[in-house]
């Protein structure tokens, strides 16, 4: 049924659980598993040398998150994408570009009441995705 499954991964506990689900779904369907980690762009107004330092730190963090996702899912580096941009937009663009049949991602609830609500990124992806979205908490 699914040929390409996209895992949106940010390193959170929800994302770690989503990684296990995405890996199992990919194995069950014989599908390609693609991992996407999006990181926010560094604001231009920081100026030099602050911009370069902030960008370096952001990229280092993104690489660590990607390495963690690769370790959890077993995907090769070429299937673990780092994308700069707002997370929901980057996930949606990757889903379109890679022709994903399913997006798997974590929700982000905080506390007893917060767990009833989706995070803003999850809401946007669910509302605009070109394919089904599986949310994991």
From Swiss-Prot:
Protein name as it appears in the record: Universal stress protein in QAH/OAS sulfhydrylase 3'region
Matches recorded under CDD domains: USP-like
InterPro entries: Rossmann-like_a/b/a_fold, Universal_stress_UspA, UspA
Pfam families in the cross-refs: Usp
Family the entry assigns: Belongs to the universal stress protein A family.
């Amino acid at each position: 049924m699914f040929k390409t499954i996209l895992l949106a991964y940010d390193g959170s506990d929800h994302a770690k659980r989503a990684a296990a689900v995405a890996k199992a779904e990919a194995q069950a369907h014989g599908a390609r598993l693609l991992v996407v980690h999006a990181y926010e762009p560094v604001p231009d107004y920081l100026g030099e040398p602050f911009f370069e330092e902030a960008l370096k730190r952001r990229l280092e963090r993104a690489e660590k998150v990607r390495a963690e996702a690769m370790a959890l899912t077993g995907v090769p580096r070429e299937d673990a994408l780092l994308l700069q941009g707002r997370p929901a937009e980057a996930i949606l663009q990757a889903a379109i570009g890679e022709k994903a049949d399913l997006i798997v991602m974590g929700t982000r609830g905080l506390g007893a009441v917060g767990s009833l609500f989706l995070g803003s990124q999850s809401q946007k992806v669910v509302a605009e995705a070109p394919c089904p979205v599986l949310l994991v908490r």
